[in-house]
Every structure is written in structure tokens, then in C-alpha cells.
Amino acid sequence: MRDRLFFLLSKYGIRPRDSIGQHFLIIEDVIEKAIETANVNENDVILEVGPGLGFLTDELAKRAKKVYTIEIDQKIIEILKKEYSWNNVKIIQGDAVRVEWPKFNKVVSNIPYKISSPFTFKLLKTDFERAVVMYQLEFALRMVAKPGSRNYSRLSLMAQALGNVEIVMKIGKGAFYPRPKVDSALVLIEPRKDKIVLNENLVKALFQHRRKTVPRALKDSIHMLGVSKDEIRGIINNVPHSNKRVFQLYPEEVKDIEEYLKKHGIIS
């Protein structure tokens, strides 16, 4: 696989573009682990983002009913069309965060790390069965961080409100070419059956001051909700979980706060 990559890079005169986060996966075992974790079968319609030179795409095409792969680099698309004769792969050119996604039931992808956050938030709002995605390790650790921990963030809260998230394996820098500056992780995401849909503006407002207590965080960022401090003065100290700091809140507790603010006409 490594030799094949270098052959193709040389054949087509490709220099990986760091500006769009091009790091090509060169370890077959990681590809196999991703496909195994996703439990890919002949009935699946797969979404992939950033196919690179097609190594993961090719294995998905052998096992899935259909593969949609999104690639922003026109030169890479031309190479894929020349090198492979897939009849069940559709290549979509564009920015994966901005283009409309086709219908799919699973995601298997080594995404460009620069789009990790917007890609993940978009994915969590989409109907799917299972996603297996390679992320920067630091990002993955934030996704699975527990309330009260150092890494717990808006990302942690939103990911865990909508999905069950698990780090399947850690991946060293040597699994990619060119070698990235960071370690990676393979992450499994499955939608929660009891999804907690939260007001995103409220979550953003709270996490502007993640180490402050809930009342203080709301007072200091209430303008983000289009409300003045005068409008909340009489109710803010009775907000649910007022003794907690923002980074200690579980998704269910943020929902309690949201419902309280709705009841008092602060948010709709």
C-alpha cells in the first residue's frame, strides 16, 4: 500500500497539500479496522469524505452497495477516475461541509482534520446508523471527555447529547504520508436512541465561560441570546443546576436549563 501510494504520487506529480489537510493513510490494518468497526455489508450506502488516492474507497466499494465520496481537489478526482473502474462509487466534488450530502446509512472516512468540527456537527444532525471516522487524537479525546474533566467542551456536550461516542483505536503519526504533526484516533459514533436536541445558541453562550457557574456564565453571555441583563435579573439565580460550573453539566442538565429559560420567555 505504501509502495502503491508513492508510485501514484510520482506518476501524477502530486505534492500533498497541507492547506487542505492532505495526509494519505498508508497502513492497511487501519483500513480493515475501520471497515470492520463499521460492519460494512452489501446493503450499505457509505459516505466517505476525502478519498485520497482511493485505498479506503476501493475496499468500501468491494463490500458496500454504494459509496459516495466527497473530494475538493479536482486533480485527485481525475486520478481516481483513471486508476479505478468502480461501478458503485459516485465522486462528488466540493467542500464536504458545504455541499448537500446524499442519503446514506453509514460513514467510513479519514477526514481532513481541518474540517473536524463543522463536519461532526453536520453529521450529528443527519440520520445515519453508524459512523467510523479518523480524527486528530486531541479532537477525539474532547469528543469522549466526561463532564467535569479538563477536556470537556461544547463539542463533548453536543456529541454526547446526540450520539454514543467511543475511541476504537489510537493511530500513530507513521500511519500517514506525509507524516502529520499529531497522533490520530479511529472513532465510532452511533446516534442515541434518546437524542437530546439542545438549543445551540444556549450551548455556545454557556461555554463562552465554561469555568463559571451557570448563573454567572448566563449573565456574562446573555447578549448572545438577544436578551439584556435586565430581562433576566429576576430569574437567573433560580436557574436549574445553578451551583454547577458549565464544564460540569450533563446534556440532560443543559436541557433543564433550556426548558427553564423557555418557560420564562428568554429563548424560544
Swiss-Prot record:
Q: What class of enzyme is it?
A: transferase
Keyword NADP assigned to the entry: answer is no
* Localization per record: Cytoplasm
- EC number(s): the record gives 2.1.1.-
In which broad location class does this protein mainly occur, judging by the first location in its UniProt entry? cytoplasm
The answer to whether keyword Methyltransferase applies is yes
Give the matching Pfam families: RrnaAD
**SUPFAM superfamilies in the cross-refs:** S-adenosyl-L-methionine-dependent methyltransferases
Which PROSITE patterns does the UniProt record give? Answer: RRNA_A_DIMETH, SAM_RNA_A_N6_MT
Q: Which domain of life is it from?
A: Archaea
What keywords sit in the KW lines?
Cytoplasm, Methyltransferase, RNA-binding, rRNA processing, S-adenosyl-L-methionine, Transferase
> Which residues of the sequence carry a binding annotation for S-adenosyl-L-methionine?
H23, L25, G50, E71, D95, N110
Q: Name one GO cellular component term.
A: cytoplasm
InterPro entries registered for this protein in UniProt: KsgA/Erm, rRNA_Ade_diMease-like_C, rRNA_Ade_Mease_Trfase_CS, rRNA_Ade_methylase_Trfase_N, rRNA_adenine_dimethylase, SAM-dependent_MTases_sf
Output one GO MF annotation.
rRNA (adenine-N6,N6-)-dimethyltransferase activity
- Please give the HAMAP family that the UniProt record associates with this protein: 16SrRNA_methyltr_A
Its biological purpose is as follows:
Specifically dimethylates two adjacent adenosines in the loop of a conserved hairpin near the 3'-end of 16S rRNA in the 30S particle. May play a critical role in biogenesis of 30S subunits.
Q: Of which family is this protein a member?
A: Belongs to the class I-like SAM-binding methyltransferase superfamily. rRNA adenine N(6)-methyltransferase family. RsmA subfamily.
Name used for this protein in its record: Probable ribosomal RNA small subunit methyltransferase A
Gene source species = Pyrococcus horikoshii (strain ATCC 700860 / DSM 12428 / JCM 9974 / NBRC 100139 / OT-3)
User: Lineage, please?
Assistant: Archaea, Methanobacteriati, Methanobacteriota, Thermococci, Thermococcales
Q: Which gene encodes it?
A: rsmA
